[in-house]
Amino acid sequence: MKKINMKGMRKLSITATAMVAAAVMALAGCGSSSSSSSSSSGSDSTSGAKTTKFVLGGLWPETGSLAYLAPPELAAEKLAVKDINDAGGVLGNKITTVDADTSDADHADQNTSAAQSVLSKNPSFIIGPASSSVVKNTYKSITSQNIPMLSMGATSAGFSGLSDYFFRTVAPDTVQGAVMGNLIAQDGVQKLAIAVFNDEYGTGLRDTIVKTASAAGVDIIYGEKDTFDPTETNFSSIATAIKASNPDATLVIAFDQTKPLLKALASAGVNTKKLYFVDGNTSDYSSELDAGLLEGSKGTIPGINPSDDFVKRLESTGVDLKNTTTYGAETYDGIILAALAAQKGGSADGKTIQANMAAVSGSTKGEKCDSYKACVALLKDGKEIQYKGQTSIGAFNDAHDPSSASIGVYKYDADNKPVFDHSQEGSVPKA
């Protein structure tokens, strides 16, 4: 899951609904599949045949536990399409879109039916899903057809080099985990307890944090191997066990389980001013918890905060962002990169886009440009480019991860809202 960037980056307050945010990185499930499209027929060609028609496929969590993530992603899609088409489109044609609702990973049938709905329109490229678990349920059906896909939020470390046709604009959990582990150690924590749900995202991130923190001298006194079921609703026994372990601080890795878990920790007498959260739950709890309960606690979220100007542009699309911009920048940049790849390669087919994604991201160390319009102008002059958009990620490496990315560190205020403190850039390990 990624990141929970909020409107007003310098006094960021992430909404409670965004609490399940990095669910984006791992959940996927309920609801019935649906799709909508501004292109009823899609591209006339297969993923390998040359074409000038760019059909953008989108897989979004419009229903289910991740539904709060859809608005900023859909707004970013609308904005990117507008910017591309206003600049002349791709290869002289306006791009069209076909979208489908994947819901979340609890209902794999909808994940796959949404993917098939989009694939039936012969897309040139697919943006999404954001969740690692939903990606796991869908990527083979997409990449096997030589259609490139890009996830804006799937942070699973195991996805590095997943497929020649899989890309992402967010760093793998190895980066966030290392930053969090070092943050815990730098804060002087000597005894750490961990509450983590039994989920690929949760345990993978936990293991990286444990490795980094332990190497820095932190003793993991609870939760190094323990997990709880994602469907758990009663956390009293876990909270009691954590209290009994007498930790200096507690790391919580969960999605929508976080609220009841926090209440249980508080009831058990655990120090809630010394908690650490990750992108799945670094959220606004101002309306859920007593004022000051989390003051001083910290969280990490992959990526940078979007600029105020970019947030305003997202709002200008008419989509109600629900006070969150989670994965908006990653979605926008992913679409722009794909359009530039088609423009550079001279065709909007999947193979051409895949072959040029790394180059337009900067792997050939071309001239820097920060907008689709500016980059296209350079391409038309025969120049190599390096698109530097909203996320400021490094060029795609051989595993199709960004070669470098930022992790934001947030600190909770007296209203139980996470406020952006600083960002730390990290290099992405090679697969």
Region annotations inferred by a language model:
Residues K2-A431:
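Extracytosolic ligand-binding ectodomains
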